[in-house]
Amino acid sequence: MARGTIASHISQFPIGTYKKAHAHGPGAHVIILSGEGYSLMWPEGEEPQRFAWQVGTLVVPPNMWFHQHFNSGPAPARYLAFKHWSPRNAQGVPISWISRRLGGTQIDYADEHPKVRSLFAEALAKHALTPRMDDVYAAEIPNLPPRAA
């Protein structure tokens, strides 16, 4: 970690919502600050595995595993994510922010695993909640890059 830095961000997401799946290198740590839910994590080509979380849980996605965070509880969820970052090696936008359709490692909602939405609806139903993602799905469509041929 010589001349390295730790980069961090806090993210909060409302009840009934979830983040896009993405993959990146090793070392990211996600500490759950509020809420309850779960994360799906999986290596390329395999089925997603579900990991429940609550306040105080530490989520550490393995190197280049896809992962996705879901707020299935009755309150907003918040997490603190941090990882090593070296400014001298930074070049442009992180690959985990770029759609797989453009060569990145972020999975657009339109391209997510078929089980994602049904698992989420089932988890929310345990709290008598429903997904609040329809506007998010619709907002993504006009900006989606075309699928590779």
Predicted regions and their residues:
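A short glycine-rich, His/Asp/Glu-containing loop-to-beta-strand
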Residues: 1-20, 27
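Intrinsic, low-complexity N-terminal interaction/targeting segments
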Residues: 1, 5-9, 39-41, 46, ...
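Conserved hydrophobic/aromatic beta-strand scaffold that supports enzyme active sites
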Residues: 8-12, 29, 50, 58-60
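Short histidine-centered beta-strand/loop micro-motifs
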Residues: 18-24, 50-52, 70-71
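Glycine- and acidic-residue-biased ligand/ion/polar-headgroup-sensing regions
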Residues: 14-15, 24-44
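Histidine-centered metal-chelating micro-motifs
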Residues: 18-19, 58-59, 64-69
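Short acidic-glycine-tyrosine-enriched beta hairpin
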Residues: 43-63
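Double-stranded beta-helix
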Residues: 70-149
